[in-house]
């Protein structure tokens, strides 16, 4: 069995090989063990910041201000650059709030992110995170119409920043049914479990990527949200299996690797290697 000190040493050695900065925060919900390395340091949060937008949406739903079944009309002026598929659709069209949230997380759709951040309010989202004790989380832009012009020439933290500790604590609340309500947490976890990009935290793990389609209950399951742009890569999520259930966040920045964001990259490999080391230790594969 890998003891905490040995695991920390192993993860530290892996992180030391990176050309930039690496931050790790992992919380074993089965044993109570934590592993933290540079966990309070602020990193570009990129699209992982969308978890906080989803959280505030569910708080608003719980308060009765919004219903997941409400319809919103997406207009041409709402379309945003970057990741997602909605910008390719003919406008105007109607869609439910739940489906907007689903696309924001599952395919990281920026148009849907704009709609929900505008609906919830950027300042409200940040204030909610502060109320939860997440002080490094900061959504700096709501993806308004001028966002990409405003970010031109700036570093990627102009959009969003967070610490690995804050992300792990946020996902822990979701995983334990403590964010908003048990029902809301379950719905958020279900959405995260549909994320189509599992190849960073899940890169070296024995995951079945299409269990529903194959009709096979997954032995190991990842519920996550990643982010990528320029020199930054990050991934945060819950990993479950027969022997453990844990939350893990790995954030990287300032790499010298110039590769495009969803291609093979030093940051995504680093996330995968650290994830595998923690998986082996906490799932008993050592």
Predicted regions and their residues:
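Beta-lactamase-like hydrolase cores
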Residues: 1-41, 277
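Structured C-terminal helix/loop/strand segments within mature extracytoplasmic catalytic/sensor domains
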Residues: 2-12, 119, 170-209, 215-286
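Sec/Tat-exported extracytoplasmic proteins
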Residues: 15-18, 59-65, 76, 105-108, ...
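Extracytoplasmic
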Residues: 19-21, 38-40, 48, 67-69, ...
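Active-site SXXK
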Residues: 32, 44-72, 167, 248
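Acidic helix-start/capping segments at beta-turn-to-alpha-helix junctions
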Residues: 69-84, 120-121, 146, 191
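Conserved catalytic neighborhood of penicillin-recognizing serine enzymes
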Residues: 79-116, 122, 153, 160
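Mid-domain, small-residue-enriched loop/turn segments at the edges of structured enzyme/sensor domains
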Residues: 117-179, 183
């Amino acid at each position: 069995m890998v003891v905490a000190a040995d695991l920390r040493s192993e993860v530290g050695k892996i992180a030391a090989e990176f050309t930039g900065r690496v931050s790790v925060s992992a919380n074993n919900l089965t044993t109570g063990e934590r592993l933290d390395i540079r966990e309070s340091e602020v990193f570009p949060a990129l699209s992982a910041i969308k978890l906080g937008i989803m959280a505030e949406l569910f708080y608003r739903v719980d308060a009765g201000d919004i219903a997941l079944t409400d319809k919103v009309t997406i207009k041409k002026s709402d379309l945003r650059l970057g990741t997602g598929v909605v910008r390719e659709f003919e406008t105007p069209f109607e869609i439910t709030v739940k489906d907007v949230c689903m696309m924001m997380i599952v395919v990281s759709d920026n148009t849907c992110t704009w709609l929900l951040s505008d609906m919830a309010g950027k300042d409200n989202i940040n204030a909610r995170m502060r109320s939860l004790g997440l002080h490094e989380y900061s959504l700096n832009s709501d993806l308004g119409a001028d966002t990409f012009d405003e970010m031109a020439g700036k570093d990627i933290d102009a959009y969003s920043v967070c610490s690995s500790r804050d992300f792990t604590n946020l996902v822990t609340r979701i995983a334990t049914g403590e964010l908003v309500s048990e029902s809301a947490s379950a719905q958020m976890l279900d959405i995260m479990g549909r994320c189509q990009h599992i190849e960073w935290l899940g890169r070296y793990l024995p995951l079945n990527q299409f269990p529903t389609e194959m009709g096979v209950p997954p032995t190991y399951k990842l519920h996550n949200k990643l982010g990528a742009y320029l020199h930054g890569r990050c991934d945060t999520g819950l990993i479950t299996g027969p022997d453990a259930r844990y939350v893990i966040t790995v954030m990287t920045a300032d790499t010298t690797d110039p590769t495009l964001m969803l291609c093979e990259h030093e940051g995504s490999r680093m996330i995968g290697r650290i994830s595998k080391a923690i998986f082996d230790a906490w799932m008993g594969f050592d």
